[in-house]
């Protein structure tokens, strides 16, 4: 089994990650790779913004992130239209069931 190099995750504390086992520990003299976490932090920030937008979508008075101005109440309108369509379809199913 080939030994993967350790990934230094906290240089000030000499903490490294062993990618083969997923264990975090101190560096013991093996080859160490120092990684920049900037790209990962940007992706995490984008994911957090998406998660916040998803949580905010539960409140029908909020505005979706990145939407055009004047879109207040779009979730409320979408919810009403969805319920109207579901009610219409359910009504048709019940009507056909009663007629047959």
From Swiss-Prot:
Give the family, as the similarity comment puts it. Belongs to the MtrB family.
A Pfam family this protein belongs to?
MtrB
Q: Which domain of life is it from?
A: Archaea
According to the UniProt entry, its GO molecular function terms are: tetrahydromethanopterin S-methyltransferase activity
UniProt keyword list: Cell membrane, Membrane, Methanogenesis, Methyltransferase, One-carbon metabolism, Transferase, Translocase, Transmembrane, Transmembrane helix
| Pathway(s) where this gene product acts | One-carbon metabolism; methanogenesis from CO(2); methyl-coenzyme M from 5,10-methylene-5,6,7,8-tetrahydromethanopterin: step 2/2
Q: What is this protein called?
A: Tetrahydromethanopterin S-methyltransferase subunit B
- NCBIfam families in the cross-refs: methano_MtrB, PRK00965.1
Q: Which cell locations does it reside in?
A: Cell membrane
Under catalytic activity, the entry for this protein gives:
5-methyl-5,6,7,8-tetrahydromethanopterin + coenzyme M + 2 Na(+)(in) = 5,6,7,8-tetrahydromethanopterin + methyl-coenzyme M + 2 Na(+)(out)
Per the record, membrane topology reads:
Single-pass membrane protein
The answer, when asked if Translocase is one of the entry's keywords, is yes
Membrane-spanning ranges: 80-100
Q: Name one GO cellular component term.
A: plasma membrane
């Amino acid at each position: 089994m080939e030994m993967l190099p350790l990934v230094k995750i906290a240089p000030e504390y000499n903490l490294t990650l062993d990618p083969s086992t997923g264990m975090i520990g101190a560096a013991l003299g093996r080859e160490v790779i120092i990684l920049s976490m900037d790209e990962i932090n940007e992706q995490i920030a984008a994911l957090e913004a998406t998660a916040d937008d998803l949580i905010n979508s539960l409140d029908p008075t909020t505005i979706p992130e990145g939407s055009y101005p004047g879109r207040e109440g779009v979730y409320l309108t979408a919810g009403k239209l969805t319920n109207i369509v579901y009610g219409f379809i359910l009504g048709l199913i019940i009507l056909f069931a009663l007629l047959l």
